[in-house]
Curated annotation (Swiss-Prot):
The name this protein goes by in its record: 1-(5-phosphoribosyl)-5-[(5-phosphoribosylamino)methylideneamino] imidazole-4-carboxamide isomerase
Membrane-traversing stretches: none
EC number: 5.3.1.16
Gene: hisA
Positions annotated as active site in the UniProt record: 8 (proton acceptor), 129 (proton donor)
Signal peptide extent: none
Listed InterPro entries: Aldolase_TIM, His_biosynth, HisA_bact_arch, Isoase_HisA-like, Isoase_HisA-like_bact, RibuloseP-bd_barrel
Family: Belongs to the HisA/HisF family.
Length: 239
């Protein structure tokens, strides 16, 4: 299982939100580059970064910070948030990003998604963020009428190989992942799944590992030390 420490960027800082609410942010580190180095130092093999400002604006607004992170660490970095054009995708790859996560564009711009998957194949990940089972977009501010299962099926048909699934109600809560929704996803698609939202303990990670979930994104639990990064990396290596 892959472990992805999370860095959420807002106004150039590393923050955490509660249930996706921008009004409920906590600054975890004023220096995201330093935070990335900390994660790498403690053994992280890859990083998950979200440009929260970009997710709302529809374009990358923390590109310079992302570039500095990519230059500061030697591990692969995947980035999502506001990536809705081929130019944005190419810019991220040009500054050293390993994989790009598309969210809103996956729902509303299928030709763009199909083109990027054709060009970059496994380098393109789709992020599906769900609120009460329906896909939320544009920084989680809009909730669509399409279910997360239906969108996942569409993504698989297009050729998407990896999906990041987030239950927004769990995000930043340390309440545990939404195992039921993840199990339903597994029954409906064969894509690799990365679970995000609510991960609070080593036991949560072990549960997802037992389900053969490909990867887990861990944010708040690392910052609040309910999960030790070195320990969780060792545990998943032994499983």
């Amino acid at each position: 299982m892959e472990i992805f420490p999370a860095i959420d960027l807002k106004e150039g800082r590393c923050v955490r939100l509660y249930q996706g609410e921008f009004s409920k942010e906590t600054v975890m580190n004023e220096d995201p580059v330093a935070q990335a180095i900390i994660f790498e130092t403690f053994g992280a093999k890859r990083l998950h970064i979200v440009d929260l400002d970009g997710a709302v604006a529809g374009e990358s607004l923390n590109l310079s910070v992302i570039e500095r992170i990519c230059k500061a660490v030697r591990i692969p970095v995947q980035v999502g948030g506001g990536i809705r054009s081929l130019v944005s995708v190419e810019k991220l790859f040009s500054v050293g990003v390993d994989k790009v996560i598309l969210g809103t564009a996956a729902l509303y711009d299928k030709p763009f998604l199909e083109e990027t998957v054709r060009l970059y194949k496994e380098k393109i990940i789709v992020g599906i963020d769900a609120k009460n089972g329906f896909v939320a977009t544009r920084g989680w501010l809009d909730v669509s009428e399409i279910s997360y299962i239906d969108l996942a099926k569409q993504m698989e048909k297009i050729g998407v190989q990896t999906i990041v699934f987030t239950d927004i109600s769990k995000d930043g809560t340390l309440a545990g992942p939404n195992v039921e929704q993840l199990e339903l996803l597994q029954k409906n698609v064969a894509t690799r799944l990365i679970a995000s939202g609510g991960i609070a303990s080593i036991q949560d990670v072990k549960k997802l590992n037992d389900m053969n979930i490909y990867g887990v994104i861990i944010g708040k639990a690392l910052y609040e030390k309910t999960i030790d990064l070195e320990e969780v990396l060792e545990v998943t290596k032994l499983c």
